[in-house]
UniProtKB/Swiss-Prot annotation:
Organism classification: Eukaryota, Metazoa, Chordata, Craniata, Vertebrata
Annotated spans, Disordered: 1-76, 182-215, 229-257, 317-336
Residues annotated as domain Helicase C-terminal: 852-1021
InterPro entries: DEAD-box_helicase_OB_fold, DEAD/DEAH_box_helicase_dom, DHX29, DNA/RNA_helicase_DEAH_CS, DSRM_DHX29, HA2_WH, Helicase-assoc_dom, Helicase_ATP-bd
Gene coding for it: dhx29
SMART domains to which the protein is assigned, alphabetical: DEXDc, HA2, HELICc
Composition skew (Low complexity), residue ranges: 18-27, 66-76
Coiled coil regions, renumbered to chain: 89-109, 285-305
Binding site for ATP: 589-596
Family: Belongs to the DEAD box helicase family. DEAH subfamily.
Key word Protein biosynthesis present: yes
Protein name from the UniProt record: ATP-dependent RNA helicase dhx29
MF-aspect GO terms: ATP binding; ATP hydrolysis activity; helicase activity; ribosomal small subunit binding; RNA binding; RNA helicase activity; translation initiation factor activity
Length: 1362
């Protein structure tokens, strides 16, 4: 074989160029590197010369670890101010990392290792980390600490980012946040340029040696480095060269220059090894030895290169490089001698002895065996073709004793000369020239099959060189990968041992008895306290005695007369007889028939005196509303003659609602809300203590009532002694009957007076209302036009036809049908063009005036009830009536607005009878249909519109949609006018419109989210929610159920693999609130601020205490703004509540003054207080005790203002409960600083606007808003919002993803924060710590968390963020 010399004008070292190119190249994870085995240590171009090696690397490269780019995320970190930065204090960061590592040590056996883990997978993981430029020792440590415990590539990467110091992290993983600027690199000051003429290799090296000898102060190391750096003047100028020039540079690899560079590095490594040995630094010695071994292995491979020149070898290095193992560092008394030439002179005989023998060969061939070109001629022809402007190759004979070698010089260009000389000698000088030509072709045509065009003898030596080069590469590859392979083998053995140990442990555990679950550890007393069960089976004789005494009382006898006047009383015996023959019946009674009070009494009396068996006289009557349960129980107690009221000592009737229970030992008839009965089902799935269940108002089709019907139908199949009565106020009874196998229907007429009904056409005709063409209630798109065809005749008799729309002549209106012929043209015009989707307030005003001036109605005593769809319509009509002079006389008119958001004082006046001669006008929504009864209503004005809460699958949000009412609702509204006398109903829609109405409204189960319902299904072990709800009266869509289950899994209430509740889900099912609010309550208890969080939860489940009186909206908004704090509606409400609590001890007058000043509803505040106490009781009953000391360290008491730290903690818990209801504020900079722009927020489903009632309605800042609900009116609005910081989202939000190179931290793929990788990993690990604490607490609710280090450090972290 032979050696090669090359020179060019730049003289740059190929190795240095390769290293520079690798450093300047962007570090993309998917970029293949030559060799692919040890890219972190060896990025030399040595392997790039070998095509087969490169191909093998590309085909069998490791799995890549991909990093998303900024373009993928759509975020420019350094320029987008909306991407907030996340920073943790340095001291706190160290403490958190220490806590994370300590927790991992204590829980190191929790990981599950895959049984299919192979050495190939471990090798892929190792190489993936290696490609990210992590050091081998760090990779091994990371894999040892993660793979053994079930970790993968991401776990190993997280471990590295968390535990390595910042200066040990590769580029792109640095902790520094500042944008790195491009720095100008200092150029190497080159020595005087050498002559460009090509000199022979030996002569050139001899000159270098002479130069060295002439300067005794110049050490061998300096000479080596100088040799390697010669011609590197313009290294930096080559950064922008084209790709093809880079490839050409890599092809010009000179093993001699690389050998010298490695020699210098080897000497450095030895010096470092000596120093570390003196310092007794074992780790440093190990690292130095590894480097020495690597340098020697590569130097040995270079010595076998065909172009290697032995003259560059140093005797000391050469002798040691032949040793199979790296030499140990020299001892202290034998310092390293860098004057290698002096040693060389002192031992000439030793050098002569080590001179290798000559390789003598004969390459003779006959003209018969080869008729083609000779190698020399082939080389000349090849150079003429490829270097046409250069002279032919020149051959120089080199005598070696009696043998010959030949040196061939090829001038590729004026600054690029190639000179090669084989080490093989021949007896013939011509054969030597052919051999030199063959070697030159071998170097010039890498990867080509040129050897097939050469004579056989030279073809064989070509193949010999090629095989030797491949063998060296393979050996080098094996040697370089040997430490990695040894480590992987050891790690795999450890994994196998660990798996065997786990199998033996699991078998042992299976033999042991399992521990009781958290459910079995619950206290019986607490369960009874949470869900009292008043209906206890016992002897009925004492109950009969009580009933007999009650029937003898004067109150019972007096009210019996009133009961006998009710329509249902006459059907009492028939109802009882039918129920004895059938276990299920449907009672259809109109409003006022008395079914809700009388049917339960019929059953009670019959069970007590006509065959009721002991323990089987327990009647439960469900109501959809709390006020209905309370009022009905009170009325029934009076009719039964009980003086003590519901739940009294001798009372047979009681009630139970969410926050109140009035029952006693004698209670045998219980009125309760539907939700209470559902919670009883969680304790007793068969309702064994109940004999009769009455479900009232089933026509309302609430979610709870439909759910209850599914369960009751299942129970009826299993219990033959249970009876069910369904009571409805409408005629929609066939559907209920068919659902329960066509059970009997008993119809009862109501006790109502006749009601005369007028439709839109009658109202317009009677009032003489004129619909102006420019009125806002006139449909502009239905202009009085008609289509005509015009025929236009042109020149030459040609004609063209045009279609035009022209105003129609008066009297040519469309025919509305025969029923409208008796109405005037003015009425027909109004009916035709009036917009049916907009309530005509002008017409309502005219109608009220008509009722006052018409002789037929003027003297009719009674109130006017106007049904409107929402608060905005109520307020608008209220303003119109208040500003009209005709209604200024307070002695004649009393105007009342009735809505749940308005003050209770106005609503209370609706139930008070006004003085004679005063007409009461009540503006209300559909709450007045069945929820409340205004006793003196005679006139009803029905706008025919309502607002329904509907769930939109596309946007996954609920919205209030204004729509037409159903026929059932229209009849209910009509019936309100016939309670006391003959009434009148004015419908602001035509008769045709009424006939087109749906018979009934869409059931609520088809319109709302189903999370709470799914919780109850799983809590009661009723199977899969999808399967269970398919049995409903109207089954919801599977996608809606799937969305509900997805949310439950996201908040951790349900297991991922099966419909089974987690400990968190078990507790959420016991809390009568939305699942997100329930989670917030539990987090509040765990973090020691249950009182404050329960207050916020109460405001979310009820209504805001802030009120807006009619005509005082501006003042009310100003009062709320003055109380605003922390850019949060929730904290503002809490502040108002704290102020009210502080002022209460001063008396009622001070309390009312505070409420009036701040536009607060005192009743709402009292309700919030009651609900808060109930929620706290429920949470504590589940075992989440919150001692006073913990509360004191959490949030302030009611008498104290909130601090900034406490506000941060409260916001964090709000985020834990309400996430993923978050949105990004779209900051808009206003030109006019006085202008207030609406706050627009980008949510996961699209843009939305903060509701005008929020304190953040005009907030303009970079940040994120948490919102309680998203509703759709004319726009999509966010109600009850709070500005939150990054920490709560990162701690309690969705899945975290890290974009290392961009320093981006992403939550749920759309929420972005700027953060170094280490901080990102910290938050990922904190999530694991939080989950571990929650799991322990939820499985053992009585466990104290007062001194828990994890919770304390998380609270400290939250409170440090501003």
């Amino acid at each position: 074989m032979g050696g090669k010399n090359k020179k060019n004008r730049h003289g740059s070292s190929t190795a240095v160029q390769g290293a520079t190119a690798a450093a300047n190249r962007p570090r993309a994870a998917a970029e293949p590197r030559p060799g692919g085995e040890d890219a972190a240590k060896k990025q030399t171009p040595r392997n790039s010369n070998v095509a087969p090696g490169s191909k093998e690397s590309n085909k069998q490269g490791p799995k890549t670890y991909s990093f998303a780019s900024s373009s993928d995320s759509g975020v420019s970190v350094n320029h987008d101010k909306s991407v907030l930065k996340v920073v943790i204090e340095a001291k706190l960061e160290k403490r958190i990392i220490s806590l994370i590592n300590e927790h991992k040590k204590l829980n190191s056996n929790k990981g599950t290792v895959s049984g299919r883990l192979t050495s190939k997978k471990l090798q892929d993981l190792y190489m993936a980390l290696q490609k990210l430029s992590f050091k081998a020792e760090h990779i091994e440590e990371a894999m040892t600490n993660t793979v053994l415990y079930g970790g993968d590539l991401h776990a190993a990467l997280d471990w590295l980012c968390l535990n390595l110091p910042d200066d040990a992290l590769p580029e792109g993983f640095s902790q520094q946040f500042v944008e790195e600027e491009q720095r100008a690199r200092a150029k190497f000051q080159a020595p005087p340029q050498r002559p460009s003429a090509a000199n022979e290799s030996a002569t050139e090296k001899g000159e270098e040696g002479a130069s060295l000898k002439g300067n005794p102060e110049l050490t061998m190391k300096e000479w080596i480095l100088r040799y390697a750096e010669q011609g590197s003047d313009d290294d930096d100028d080559d950064d922008d060269v084209k790709e093809e020039e880079k490839e050409t540079t890599l092809e010009k690899f000179d093993p001699n220059e690389r050998y010298l560079e490695l020699t210098a590095k080897l000497l450095d490594a030895r010096a470092q090894a000596t120093a570390t040995k003196q310092d007794k630094d074992k780790q440093g010695q190990k690292e130095a030895q590894e480097r020495i071994r690597g340098y020697q292995q590569e130097m040995k491979s270079l010595e076998d290169h065909p172009l290697f020149n032995p003259a560059v070898k140093i005797p000391e290095v050469k002798s040691e490089s032949k040793q199979p193992k790296p030499a140990l560092p020299p001892s202290e008394d034998e310092p390293l001698n860098f004057n290698l030439f002096e040693k060389k002179e002192n031992a000439p005989e030793e050098k002569a002895k080590k001179k290798p023998p000559l390789d003598i060969r004969n390459f003779d061939y006959t003209s018969r065996s080869w008729t083609g070109k000779s190698p020399k001629q082939f080389l000349i022809d090849w150079c003429r073709k490829h270097y046409s402007k250069s002279p032919n190759p020149s051959f120089e004979k080199v005598p070696v004793g009696k043998y010959w070698k030949s040196r061939v010089k090829i001038i590729k260009s004026h600054d690029d000369v190639m000179c090669v000389c084989p080490t093989i000698v021949t007896e013939d000088s011509m054969q030597a020239q052919h051999l030199a030509a063959t070697l030159a072709l071998y170097e010039l045509t890498k990867g080509q099959s040129v050897h097939q065009l050469l004579p056989p003898t030279y073809r064989n030596v070509w193949l010999e060189w090629s095989d030797a080069e491949k063998q060296v590469q393979e050996q080098n590859k094996t040697e370089s990968n040997k430490p990695r392979d040894q480590f992987i083998t050891k790690l795999l053995n450890k994994l196998k041992v660990q798996q065997n140990q786990l199998k033996s442990c699991s078998q042992t555990q299976m033999m042991e008895d399992p521990e009781d679950s958290w459910e079995n550890l619950a206290c019986d007393e607490e369960q009874h306290e949470t869900c009292p069960s008043p209906l206890l089976p016992d002897d009925l004789e004492p109950i009969r005695n009580i009933f007999r005494k009650s029937r003898d009382s004067m109150k019972y006898k007096r009210l019996l007369n009133d009961r006998e006047q009710l329509p249902v009383f006459a059907r009492g015996n028939f109802i009882l007889e039918t129920l004895k023959r059938h276990r299920v019946i449907v009672v259809a009674g109109e409003t006022g028939s008395g079914k809700s009070t009388q049917v339960p009494q019929f059953l009670l009396e019959d069970l007590l005196f006509n065959g009721g068996s002991p323990g089987k006289c327990n009647i439960v009557c469900t109501q959809p509303r709390r006020i209905s349960a309370m009022s009905l129980a009170t009325r029934v107690c009076e009719e039964l003659g009980c003086d003590s009221g519901p739940g009294g000592k001798n009372s047979l009737c009681g009630y139970q609602i969410r926050m109140e229970s009035r029952t006693g030992e004698a209670t045998r008839l219980l009125y309760c809300t539907t939700g209470i009965l559902l919670r009883k089902l969680q304790e007793d799935s068969m309702l064994k203590n109940i004999s009769h269940i009455i479900v009232d108002e089933v026509h309302e089709r609430t979610v709870q009532s439909d759910f209850l019907l599914i369960i009751l139908r299942e129970i009826l199949h299993k219990r033959s002694d249970l009876h069910l009565v369904l009571m409805s106020a409408t005629v929609d009874c066939e559907k209920f009957s068919s659902y329960f196998t066509h059970c009997p229907i008993i119809r009862i007429s109501g006790r109502t007076f006749p009601v005369e009904v007028f439709h839109l056409e009658d109202v317009v005709e009677a009032t003489g209302f004129v619909l102006e063409q420019d009125s806002e209630y006139c449909q502009k798109f239905l202009e009085d036009e008609e289509e005509i065809t015009l025929s236009v005749t042109g020149k030459g008799g040609s004609s063209k036809k045009y279609q035009e729309f022209i105003p129609a002549q008066s009297g040519t209106g469309l025919d509305l049908g025969a029923r409208y012929q008796r109405y005037s043209s003015q009425t027909r015009h109004a009916v035709l063009y009036m917009n049916p989707n907009k309530i005509n307030l002008d017409l309502i005003l005219e109608l009220l005036v008509f009722l006052d001036i018409s002789p037929e109605y003027r003297n009719v005593e009674g109130a006017v009830l106007i049904f409107l769809p929402g608060l905005a319509d109520i307020q608008q009509l209220y303003d119109i009536l208040s500003s009209d002079k005709r209604f200024h006389d307070r002695r004649r008119y009393k105007l009342i607005a009735l809505h749940s958001i308005l003050s209770s004082q106005d609503q209370a006046e609706a139930f008070i009878l006004p003085p004679a001669g005063t007409r009461k006008i009540v503006l209300a929504t559909n709450i007045a249909e069945t929820g409340i009864t205004i006793p003196d209503v005679v006139f009803v004005i029905d706008a025919g519109r309502t607002k329904e809460n509907r769930y939109h699958e596309s946007s996954q949000m609920s919205s209030l949609v204004e729509t037409f009412i159903s026929k059932a609702s229209a009849l209910q509204r009509q019936g309100r006018a016939g309670r006391v006398r003959n009434g009148y109903c004015f419908r602001l829609y035509t008769r045709e419109r009424f006939e087109s109405f749906m018979e009934y409204s869409v059931p609520e189960i088809l319109r709302v989210p189903l999370e709470e319902l799914c919780l109850h299904i799983m809590k009661c072990d009723l199977g899969s929610p999808e399967d269970f709800l398919s049995k409903a009266l109207d089954p919801p869509q599977l996608q809606v159920i799937s969305n509900a289950m997805s949310l439950l899994r996201k908040i951790g209430a349900c297991e991922l693999s099966q419909p089974k509740l987690t400990p968190l889900g078990q507790h959420l099912a016991a809390l009568p609130v939305n699942v997100k609010i329930g989670k917030m309550l539990i987090f509040g208890a765990i973090f020691g601020c249950l009182d404050a969080v329960a207050t916020l939860a109460a405001t979310m489940t009820e209504k805001s205490p802030f009120v807006t009186p009619i005509g005082e909206k501006d003042r009310a908004d100003l009062a709320k703004s003055s109380m605003a704090v922390a850019n949060s509606d929730h904290v503002t409400i809490f502040r108002a509540y704290l102020g009210w609590k502080a002022i209460r001890p001063e008396g009622y007058a001070a309390e009312m003054s505070y409420c009036r000043k701040n536009f607060l509803n005192r009743k709402a505040l009292l309700t919030i207080e009651d609900v808060k106490q109930e929620l706290i009781r429920l949470v504590r009953a589940a075992g989440f005790e919150c001692p006073r000391s913990v509360e004191a360290n959490g949030l302030s008491s009611a008498m104290k203002a909130l601090s900034a730290e406490e506000t941060s903690l409260l916001k964090a818990i709000l985020t834990a409960g309400l996430y993923d209801n978050v949105g990004k504020i779209l900051f808009t900079k206003s030109v006019d600083i006085t202008e207030k722009l609406a706050c627009i927020v980008e949510t996961a489903q699209g843009k939305a606007q903060v509701h005008p009632s929020s304190v953040n309605r005009d907030l303009q800042i970079y940040g994120w808003l948490l919102y309680q609900e998203k509703v759709k009116y004319s726009k999509v609005f966010l109600r009850e919002t709070t500005l939150i910081s990054p920490f709560p989202v990162l701690l309690f939000g969705g899945d975290i993803a890290v974009q290392h190179r961009e320093r981006l931290l992403t939550v749920d793929d759309w929420i972005h924060f700027q953060a170094p990788v280490k901080i990102a990993v910290i938050f990922k690990e904190l999530r694991i710590l939080i989950e571990s604490v929650l799991k322990q607490k939820l499985e053992n609710p009585k466990m104290s968390l007062k001194d828990d280090m994890i919770l304390n450090i998380i609270k400290e972290l939250i409170k440090t963020e501003r």
